[in-house]
Amino acid sequence: VTGIEALGEVLRRHRRDASLSVELVESGPRLLPGLPPALDADLRRLCEPYAVNFRTATAIAAVSAQGVRLAEGTRLRSELTLWTAGLAPPPLLRESGLARSAQGWADVRPTLQSRHFDNVFVAGDAAQLPRAVAKQAYNAIDMGALAAANAARFLGGRALQPFKPAPKPVLVAFGDLQTYLVAGRTVLASQVLAAAKEGVHQAFMLQMAPGGVVSALPAAAGRLWQSWRRLALPQLLSLADFRKLPDCKPVRRL
């Protein structure tokens, strides 16, 4: 998702620059491999007017100041390379003994308790559950709350509770060209949804505000209003823009 959203922001700012040429390299078989396949086709359609070339099922061997070398030997010259690859476990996990598997993440039980140290609980991207969950902010926040609660239960000699990931919709912003709401196999697309994505982001940030929700609320409300004014209001007169991608289940129009 990060690479696609970065491309959207590049096109937002520079798509009218005739000298712009973009190569997007994806190791997976298609764009956004963890989301419905129709997103791949729709993103490619949106990029047709611009000098964007997609290379899927392609691995990168090296990155230098001059460009990128692909695993199959091709060299892509670049004035600017944006690296938006996925996650890598920090060495601390293995050095501390929390991670002992080949993947390098901290091995935890369903309760987020370390498999190697009973008095350690691990939350967020660092935790490797028996049944993998998406390494996303919404899961990390829920895991943090459960880890704290389970630590208290552990100290009190009470039974620990397992982590149960709650299914949540995903919002993918593609600059000012499109925003997608993905809920399971259902996808809704509209530029109006860009403000909704900002709203979700601000809601997550409020949960982690150092001074608490009340003190952070005015600033968050101001940022949300700015995004609504810039991103949503210009589109409200054209609600017909809401559309469903072709291979997804029918959904009620917003």
Task: Indicate residue ranges for each PLM-predicted region.
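Glycine-centered tight beta-turn/hairpin loop motif at sheet-sheet or coil-to-beta transitions
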Residues: 71-73
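FAD-binding beta-loop-beta segment adjacent to the flavin cofactor pocket
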Residues: 104-121, 160-163, 176-187, 193
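FAD-site-proximal beta/loop scaffold in flavoenzymes
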Residues: 75-142
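C-terminal auxiliary extensions adjacent to catalytic cores
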Residues: 176-254
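Rossmann-like dinucleotide-binding cores of NAD(P)H-dependent redox enzymes
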Residues: 6-58
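A conserved short coil-to-beta-strand element within the FAD-binding core of flavoproteins
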Residues: 56-67
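A conserved FAD-binding loop/helix module that cradles the flavin
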Residues: 93-94, 126-175
